[in-house]
Amino acid sequence: MERREEQPGAAGAGAAPALDFTVENVEKALHQLYYDPNIENKNLAQKWLMQAQASPQAWHFSWQLLQPDKVPEIQYFGASALHIKISRYWSDIPTDQYESLKAQLFTQITRFASGSKIVLTRLCVALASLALSMMPDAWPCAVADMVRLFQAEDSPVDSQGRCLALLELLTVLPEEFQTSRLPQYRKSLVRTSLAVECGAVFPLLEQLLQQPSSPSCVRQKVLKCFSSWVQLEVPLQDCEALIQAAFAALQDSELFDSSVEAIVNAISQPDAQRYVNTLLKLIPLVLGLQDQLRQAVQNGDMETSHGICRIAVALGENHSRALLDQVEHWQSFLALVNMIMFCTGIPGHFPVNETTSSLTLTFWYTLQDDILSFEAEKQAVYQQVYRPVYFQLVDVLLHKAQFPSDEEYGFWSSDEKEQFRIYRVDISDTLMYVYEMLGAELLSNLYDKLGRLLTSSEEPYSWQHTEALLYGFQSIAETIDVNYSDVVPGLIGLIPRISISNVQLADTVMFTIGALSEWLADHPVMINSVLPLVLHALGNPELSISSVSTLKKICRECKYDLPPYAANIVAVSQDVLMKQIHKTSQCMWLMQALGFLLSALQVEEILKNLHSLISPYIQQLEKLAEEIPNPSNKLAIVHILGLLSNLFTTLDVSHHEDDHEGSELRKLPVPQGPNPVVVVLQQVFQLIQKVLSKWLNDAQVVEAVCAIFEKSVKTLLDDFAPMVPQLCEMLGRMYSTIPQASALDLTRQLVHIFAHEPAHFPPIEALFLLVTSVTLTLFQQGPRDHPDIVDSFMQLLAQALKRKPDLFLCERLDVKAVFQCAVLALKFPEAPTVKASCGFFTELLPRCGEVEPVGKVVQEDGRMLLIAVLEAIGGQASRSLMDCFADILFALNKHCFSLLSVWIKEALQAPGFPSARLSPEQKDTFSQQILRERVNKRRVKEMVKEFTLLCRGLHGTDYTADY
């Protein structure tokens, strides 16, 4: 509790001896905390004050700090210290002092009833904590006693002050309960006790709220107190009178916010749905607010409309199932639904003119789920009633999704535009969900409206209306399979008729085409209707994201039908790339689109297109390779390498991706001869080496080079084989000069794909031995500066053991050094590195029997590994990593049982190891548990979690309740 040697001096004491926890020193430290301009001094003071609050002396100085002659800041600290002592150190208080402590707190609260409100609140919180710790046995009628004591007439404080102090105390009591650190069994007892005690609270609150003489401040406090108590899951029928009083209080503008909060909290209790009769009584009360709601909307009173909407939604959303079940009351519930519809369609643009409509969206999900969960017969009845409601909802949502006029939108802040974007996404999600209720009729409905809008000659249509209807289509088509819809051909036919005069409309047209790309793949004759629009949009930088992402979707989904358009697509793409119209990320997407496109062409066509597409970049790269390195040409190099790697990511002439997706047999025959990507890579290999020679010490450039090959390897798989020898050689030279994590990651890919093939084993083995040797040297020099390299190295070793354990049979591999370095890596502070090291050991230990050098090193150095694992569990590693260390223990037990049974007993015999908090019995129990469990990995993880809590002194604390 009290550790004097660690206390920093207060009040500028600096390195002076630690100060005693006296009233004077606390006051000096508080002065320093509030008024010293030096931030270090403030931090020292704060640390010292926290220690002071935890010290035994806090019981003494807290009361003195509450004296009337002290300023509120000092009194507040005294009250806070009392709360901390009571809530966190309750076990230190002798039982014979409970009553005197209670009496002192009552006295102080009475005194501060007419004093500082912040101090009063802290004292009330302290007394609330005391009550919770004493209930129900040591203080069985705590709440009734509080009410009785504060109603006593002999108090020196005026009745209003006493009343407000009592209400503050009653308000913080449930709040303190919600945040208290009571053990679970105590929490349950106290909750039951409080639920009984609400009988002493609610009549008082009703009386104060309903009597005309109660001042506004008292009635507001009553509502807050009620709001606090209902969160204890008080039966809704017991709250009926107070809820009705709160509804009446909604007419008072000063009480409006508190009334809303109280009503919403009462209605939203999880248990409230059991009290259907009370819920039915609430519907007329909510419907009775409609005039007030309409008046608020008319007057632009956003706060009032927002509050009333919260109440309606709370009732509808939390209890739709219970209210739907009351078939004889269907009309009143439908009226509530229509009231919520009014809130959804509240006039004005979100979030500038209104912030209410967004509250209602989840209600429509809930109502639909509840309707669709009924048995077929009942569902059919409700569908008849609510399908028209949901069609109306679609109209309302699409109206709300409309952009404002260009002029108005121009005045919106970037934050308002972002909120509106998110709001539209929420509307999109709702529309997609509503499709489940309305089905294909919804698409027909949208199509008819769009058709009428675009073909009407009576009046010019607004682009906003068109955009919203398209947005509705897009929302549904993005996630629902519309391939069998009979309206999509008509929609594709309508799109070219849209007069696009606005960026937002153009964006939505693009995204709608993108959402229909799978449909276009099944109806390729329609591609020509929309492709020209997409290619035209590519030239507009304002449509960068929508046009490029749409082209990428079309090239991915429709690639086998695009050869007739390939030349045009490549030409337009080349043009926009050369003009640098798009940002880097969109350029990368465009290259991926072209990769998909080229994959479906004949090899000669691919090579011809590749040549025209990348020649300008190769020439630029040749020029850059001659220049002296500087920041601007580095950016250009990384950009060009990025373009190439993104192109090669998707250029797959063997159609591996189609194999994964189980595509129809529309793909082209697998071409004979070298892969076009390999041809290009071989042509530019010397150039890439030249670039590397100048930029070897730049991680970004090395990463970009490795990315080209890594993405190519992942896409080409076995087709990459001709490149393996020269790439292994280049990687070896790179890594020998300056080790980089990206080179190890690429080596891991090569090991994964090619190490098991005899033809490629020699170059891969040579590379593996080389990078291992270089990395081991790095360990000797100080690996702590390179956690990323160590992480990648551990992943490489694990992959080697998984794919080709023979790599560990080579005499030139120092398995012992590798093992020791991996043990060292277990002690790194970086979690990913530790995880990777654990992953290596869980791959290594099962190989003890089959790979002789591995078995030998485990026998010789396995004890060292166990010690490191136990140290980590003992407290040296983050608790979040315990599952990884448990995996090592499980592997040791499963594959090296006889060794582990000796090592673990020897290791745990050492005094204070792995933690001074452990008893010999606890250590013995742990070792026996571990040695017994060789099958159930989950059980071992549970044992390790429990043991690490014991080691850290956290076992059984609330702090670890969710661990």
Curated annotation (Swiss-Prot):
Alphabetical list of Pfam families matching this protein: IBN_N, Importin_rep, Importin_rep_2, Importin_rep_3, TPR_TNPO3_IPO13_2nd, TPR_TNPO3_IPO13_3rd, TPR_TNPO3_IPO13_4th, Xpo1
UniProt keyword annotations, A-Z: Cytoplasm, Nucleus, Protein transport, Repeat, Transport
Domain Importin N-terminal: 45-111
InterPro entries noted in UniProt: ARM-like, ARM-type_fold, Exportin-1/Importin-b-like, Importin-beta_N, Importin_beta-like_NTR, Importin_rep_1, Importin_rep_2, Importin_rep_3
Residue stretches of each HEAT repeat: 24-54, 56-88, 95-135, 142-179, 194-231, 236-268, 276-325, 330-372, 375-438, 440-476, 487-522, 524-558, 562-600, 603-648, 676-716, 720-754, 761-803, 815-845, 860-893, 897-931
Keyword Glycoprotein assigned: no
Chief location: cytoplasm
GO MF annotation terms: small GTPase binding
Record GO biological process: protein import into nucleus
One GO location term (cellular component): cytoplasm
Subcellular location: Cytoplasm; Nucleus
SUPFAM superfamilies associated with the record: ARM repeat
Function: Functions in nuclear protein import as nuclear transport receptor. Serves as receptor for nuclear localization signals (NLS) in cargo substrates. Is thought to mediate docking of the importin/substrate complex to the nuclear pore complex (NPC) through binding to nucleoporin and the complex is subsequently translocated through the pore by an energy requiring, Ran-dependent mechanism. At the nucleoplasmic side of the NPC, Ran binds to the importin, the importin/substrate complex dissociates and importin is re-exported from the nucleus to the cytoplasm where GTP hydrolysis releases Ran.
Family: Belongs to the importin beta family.
Complex formation: Interacts with UBC9, RAN, RBM8A, eIF-1A and PAX6.
Protein name (record): Importin-13
Organism: Bos taurus (Bovine)
Taxonomic classification: Eukaryota, Metazoa, Chordata, Craniata, Vertebrata
Gene from which this protein is expressed: IPO13
